[in-house]
Amino acid sequence: RKVFQVKILSGAREKGRIAEIFNYCKKQGVAVTNVSQRELNSISPNHQGVALETSGYPYHTLYDILDNANKKGEAPFLLFLDALKDPQNLGTLLRTAEIVGVHGVFLPYRHTATITPAVVNASSGASEHMMVSQVNLSQSIDLLKEKGIWFIGLDISEEAESLSTINFNGPLALVVGSEAKGMRSLVRKSCDHLLRLPMRGKVESLNAAVAGSIVLYLAWQSRGFA
């Protein structure tokens, strides 16, 4: 993204990491403005003393993401998020996805958290390194299945399969549903496999971001941490 301006908390530019950011901006010719705590809070409650004014988030196409995997010579490893609402959950999953080498993340056009300052912050900047696409999920799933990609949806129903039966190798897409309702019916029916994580406690389910992160790591491990 193009950075237009950096806003730094007044009196903080001489301290640690913020001083490094200030000096880097000077070298790059980026405008730096001192602002009050109140102004930074109005931009993002968790600003850590600095905020950037940038161009809009550069969403990618489905084909951009497939090309990304192809250029790396790797089987596609994708993440579909079906109507996830919480910015913290989206940020957490973007962070995990970037760490384990997911080639792209897919969001629906509506009824979802999108890439906002809160999500960028929650992802610890991983959103800036991850290819994200907004699509019609059901249509995209059908298209990608025709290209040989298998879809595994996280589910808590009794009909869902156990971990031992799932093959995470090869072209793969993991689907994580919304916090309250899970996957929508059409998306759920489109999955090749439904996966239920084993649990031994009294709580019925895991947080969506936690469950998704666990399976992303398990898939990465199965793929040889490559």
What are these regions (language model features)?
Residues 36, 82, 108-109, 136, ...:
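Short beta->alpha connector loops at strand-helix junctions that form conserved
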